[in-house]
């Protein structure tokens, strides 16, 4: 780290995920940890930059973002159905490496991401040096999964090949017309068309997955076993357990150990069988 801070080494890494501004911006925020017995991924394909781009949500750091002590210029983009070619020039005063990213996008507004990463290449350049690079598209470029055919199909439409330094720092663009099919899944309406998946209803999600949703609640009359989690504890034992964990959490907060206090959240999804392993012999199989 010291070598990077002092400039002895020029950084060239890129973020492999998007950093949101706040947790409420995350596509799964309305449902994550909100149910007892199920975990619903109603966001479907809208994960990471696919969601933030589709819904127009500002982000703190975009997918593919990175820092460098030099600057790079992109030029002379040429596009075919299989690859993108361009020239990259180091326009700064120090040597560096750039990760050039190619996204395939469109403006049709259907049930699909507005752009998806399809290829990338890392090129190291001295000050003033240029390099002509070719970036092949991924094997599923211009394709979508068709649940009716149970396979990936090429989707026919006009695409925009976008080349940039991150998902939100696009330097060059060129359109290309691709012949193919139009799977019916793309015509899905509602939240899945707009990308505003925070508003996906249970009915929309059931229609997407093709089956009714199971109950999100634990069965109240089912007996507990070794694989049941502590949060399922009921009756006097459950009440004592909740009071005890809450007291530990509050005590840790009072003495300023806020990180340790957060660890108490990990108790609830822990199965009863874990007590035996973590109690140093205080809890035996017979006790469970």
Predicted regions and their residues:
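Intrinsically disordered, low-complexity Pro/Gly/Ser/Thr-rich segments with frequent PxxP/GP/PP motifs
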Residues: 109-147
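Charged, amphipathic alpha-helical linkers/stalks
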Residues: 174-243
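Terminal connector regions
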Residues: 139-186
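Secreted, periplasmic, or luminal enzymes acting at the cell surface/secretory milieu
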Residues: 1-97, 103, 156, 160-163
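Short, hydrophobic/aromatic beta-strand segments
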Residues: 95-102, 113, 145-148
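Intrinsic-disorder/low-complexity, polar/charged segments enriched in Ser/Thr/Lys/Arg/Asp/Glu/Gln
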Residues: 81-85, 130-134, 171-173
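C-terminal non-catalytic accessory extensions
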Residues: 256-288
């Amino acid at each position: 780290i010291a070598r990077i801070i002092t400039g002895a080494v020029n950084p060239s890494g890129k973020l492999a995920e998007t950093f949101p501004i706040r947790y409420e911006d995350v596509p799964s925020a309305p449902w994550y940890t909100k149910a007892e017995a199920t975990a619903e991924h109603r966001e479907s394909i809208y994960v990471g930059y696919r969601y933030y781009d589709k819904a127009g949500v500002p982000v703190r750091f975009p997918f593919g973002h990175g820092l460098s002590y030099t600057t790079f210029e992109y030029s002379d983009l040429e596009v075919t159905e299989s690859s993108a070619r361009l020239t990259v020039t180091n326009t700064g005063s120090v040597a560096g490496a750039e990760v050039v990213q190619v996204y395939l996008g469109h403006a049709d507004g259907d049930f699909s991401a507005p752009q998806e990463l399809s290829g990338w290449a890392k090129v190291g350049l001295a000050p003033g040096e240029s390099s002509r690079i070719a970036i092949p598209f991924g094997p599923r470029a211009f394709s979508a999964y068709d649940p009716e055919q149970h396979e990936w199909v090429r989707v026919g439409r006009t695409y925009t090949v976008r080349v940039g330094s991150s998902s939100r720092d696009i330097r060059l663009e060129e359109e290309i017309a691709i012949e193919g099919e139009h799977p019916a899944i793309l015509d899905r309406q509602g939240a899945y068309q707009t990308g505003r998946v925070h508003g996906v209803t249970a009915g929309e999600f059931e229609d997407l997955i093709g089956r009714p949703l199971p109950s999100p609640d634990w069965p109240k009359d089912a007996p507990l076993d070794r694989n049941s989690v502590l949060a399922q504890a009921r009756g006097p034992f459950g009440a004592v357990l909740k009071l005890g964990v809450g007291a530990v959490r509050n005590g840790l907060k009072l003495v300023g150990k806020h990180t340790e206090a957060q660890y108490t959240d990990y108790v609830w999804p822990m199965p009863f069988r874990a007590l035996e392993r973590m109690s140093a012999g205080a809890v035996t199989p017979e006790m469970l």
